[in-house]
Amino acid sequence: MRTFFRPALAAIIIFSVLTGVIYPALVTVIAQVTFPGQANGSLIEQAGQQRGSSLIGQQFDQPEYFWGRLSATGPVPYNAAASSGSNYGPLNPALAEAVQARIDALKAADPSNQLPIPVDLVTASASGLDPEISPAAANYQVQRVAAARGLAVEQVQQLVEQHTSQRTLGVLGEPRVNVLQLNIALDQIKSLD
């Protein structure tokens, strides 16, 4: 039995050091050298202060800001520690109630808007942390944001177009708008007026 104990203990120690110390340290160094922004969370800074991450959505509910997708990480919205597949099933009455509540909130915030409400404005993403919305969801909100900020609709529309990312490699994913980056750009325009 002793003859098996030493090699087993040595293997545990060696592989613990390799996989628990050396490999993570090597990956961290490579990430910091090759992709420092992404390795540190893709943080967005404005005036020397961190405003958030381009990878995790934030709660915006003021009329002068674009609103993102619903967060499924209750009770604290966009809590990365609570991320999970927490969407209701399609037959769950709670889903219909949540969607109707969001529709009512969107209509109350912009009663004159006759555009169809995009589905991503009334449903949560699988993770509940989605930082992006569709261009249709951004376009739906242009009039409300422009009116709340006293800006021309065309100016806000142009900002949405500037912040629309196209499909990756031309075929992967869908066009999308990062809500935090768009709202930061709005704040910069407003501060110039």
From Swiss-Prot:
InterPro entries: KdpC. The system is composed of three essential subunits: KdpA, KdpB and KdpC. Its main location: membrane. It comes from the Bacteria. It holds the Pfam family KdpC. It is a single-pass membrane protein. It is found in: Cell membrane. This is Potassium-transporting ATPase KdpC subunit. One of its GO terms (cellular component) is plasma membrane. NCBIfam families: kdpC, PRK00315.1. Part of the high-affinity ATP-driven potassium transport (or Kdp) system, which catalyzes the hydrolysis of ATP coupled with the electrogenic transport of potassium into the cytoplasm. This subunit acts as a catalytic chaperone that increases the ATP-binding affinity of the ATP-hydrolyzing subunit KdpB by the formation of a transient KdpB/KdpC/ATP ternary complex. GO terms for molecular function: ATP binding; P-type potassium transmembrane transporter activity. Belongs to the KdpC family. Keywords: ATP-binding, Cell membrane, Ion transport, Membrane, Nucleotide-binding, Potassium, Potassium transport, Transmembrane, Transmembrane helix, Transport. HAMAP family: KdpC (MF_00276). The chain crosses the membrane at residues 10-30.
